[in-house]
Amino acid sequence: MSPFFHYGHIAPQRVALEIKNSNLPPEDKDAYLEEMIVRRELADNFCHYEKNYDQFEGFHAWAHKTLNEHRNDEREFVYSPEEFEYSETHDDLWNAAQDEMKIKGKMHGFMRMYWAKKILEWSPSPEIAQQTAIELNDKYQIDGSCLLYTSDAADEGGS
């Protein structure tokens, strides 16, 4: 639904009301609404109020601490931004998600989280990972500019 929210084709409020009034199991309603409202709004709010939202300096202190503690960890795989863009990793699932994004302009939310976290894992630094994820996201995702999955805005410290 992200592209439809992003371009105003449907309001998140309308979707929330329809879900609330549906016959879906309560746990399904809660899961969808948590993702749509809480995480999405946290990311929007973070980007609105944090002037460095798209830079390493804009991350929360707990994220700085964790990323810096692991900055020099040995990585089994390291890829360039170009290798990421052209789906040239060892991971077939990641490559398929990247290809889907390039072809359809969209990727399922859980895959988008996996996609962004693997870019971090397989990049030489958090700064390069963030820049790569933002550039690929903004180039190929229909909703572009969505930092929900490339920032720490929706993550909790220590999780």
Predicted regions and their residues:
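Fungal-biased detection of long, low-complexity, Ser/Thr-
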Residues: 138-148
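Active/binding-pocket-proximal capping segment
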Residues: 52-53, 60-64, 70, 112-140
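N-terminal low-complexity segments that are often proline-rich with Ser/Thr-Pro
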Residues: 157-159
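Gly/Thr-rich phosphate-binding loop signature of adenosyl cofactor/nucleotide-binding cores
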Residues: 1-108
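Conserved small/polar residues in nucleotide/adenosyl-binding loops
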Residues: 149-154
